[in-house]
Amino acid sequence: MSPLQWLTISFALIIFHSLTVSSSVLSHSDRVTRLPGQPRVGFQQYSGYVTVDDKKQRALFYYFAEAETNPSSKPLVLWLNGGPGCSSLGVGAFSENGPFRPKGPILVKNQHSWNQEANMLYLETPVGVGFSYSTQSSHYEGVNDKITARDNLVFLQRWFLKFPHYLNRSLFITGESYAGHYVPQLAELMIQYNKKHHLFNLRGIAIGNPVLEFATDFNSRAEYFWSHGLISDSTYKMFTSYCNYSRYVSEYYRGSMSSMCSKVMSQVSTETSRFVDKYDVTLDVCIPSVLSQSKVVSPNQVGESVDVCVEDETVNYLNRRDVQEALHARLIGVREWTVCSNVLDYQLLDVEIPTINIVGSLVKAGVPVLVYSGDQDSVIPLTGSRTLVSRLAKQLGLRTSVPYRVWFAGQQVGGWTQVYGNVLSFATVRGASHEVPFSQPERSLVLFKAFLDGHPLPEEF
């Protein structure tokens, strides 16, 4: 019997079984009794491994925080960070929208955690990221988007075996940065799988500052730098005429850097200054920097951070033995947990493969899509994302259902938004960085709630 057939039979049995089993049964081995230094909370947490390839012993690590209140009536949301190769546990759960943030030896409550509105599932993917591992190091080589999407699909299938009462729950997939590749490709596989075995109740995807189309996303950086006064007129001309950013990245990863691109990027780097955080151009920087979020989107600036003015509390916390024991986590083949993988050899040229066309197919299939942008991010600027969404709406023949306007959060302008055909949405988040939930937690929560509810963003206080 093939693994797929076995899974299908297992799901049928579980659906029947889950009708008679209460949620109390979920006090299984993955339950987190209490994280070290954690404040008292009323929701359940789980973490552990799901094997995605029994033969090769490849396992993905997850952290699951149920909703603070009424988890049985709230949707399931999968969160994926990008990189490729950066941790959804360290960046997403413990620095952005999860229930806690490390502060010295303790955890403090995130007052704008997304598990106020949903059951949040964070996945360290692909294998080789964070606590996710393979027993054979050769499996870290040549990893690409297709392998990652396939493993993520198998993860979800098998995760439902652990949590059967979430099988029919509304499911949303969210993420940021290179998750602009991860999220649409996973959603596409889910829709294909559902044609034969209806398993996933996919209700929408939301991606923040996403890599969707190589040239448009990357080349919008020049205009962003120039419009924010970070480069001169002459450098802007060089950056748009002689060597744009997509050409630079392409040459960089092919190991064939031209003298022209080297000269242009040297001038751009000199003018923008290494003391300006490209992920949040308004943020004052400190040394040392904190959390590396991206290798692909900024190859000459590996090591930039979520917040460069804060000590790396997350790395210290997740490398504590007592924390790893509480999370049921293991270090396999590595000496320490890192925010972004040092062992993963990802096929970085996959960044050149557009995923905006997959987003279009999802929209045509009736899956609501939200693309949102922190407006202080110069790495994947809002201008590129806005252009791509507008262009896609035109290609699909979608008319504007919510004209471009401001939206509000906490009696302040939260950003701007436009909706096409009540299924494709674009929104900016005012004052937000590449990592929107980190830099603007309240506004990101308002955005998240509206997305889950299927409502337009608030147009008044």
Curated annotation (Swiss-Prot):
GO MF annotation, one: serine-type carboxypeptidase activity
Keywords: Carboxypeptidase, Disulfide bond, Glycoprotein, Hydrolase, Protease, Secreted, Signal
Documented EC number(s): 3.4.16.-
Intracellular or extracellular location(s): Secreted
Signal peptide: 1-24
UniProt-listed PROSITE patterns: CARBOXYPEPT_SER_HIS (PS00560), CARBOXYPEPT_SER_SER (PS00131)
Tissue specificity remark: Ubiquitous.
Keyword RNA-binding: no
A cellular component term, taken from the record's GO annotations: plant-type cell wall
The protein's enzyme class: hydrolase
BP GO terms, sorted: proteolysis
Keyword Lyase (UniProt): no
Disulfide bonds listed in the record: C86-C340, C243-C261, C286-C309
Positions annotated as glycosylated: N168, N244
Active site: S177, D377, H434
Biological role stated in the UniProt entry: Probable carboxypeptidase.
PANTHER family: SERINE CARBOXYPEPTIDASE-LIKE 45, SERINE PROTEASE FAMILY S10 SERINE CARBOXYPEPTIDASE
Family stated for the protein in its record: Belongs to the peptidase S10 family.
Name under which the protein is recorded: Serine carboxypeptidase-like 45
Organism of origin: Arabidopsis thaliana (Mouse-ear cress)
GN (gene name): SCPL45
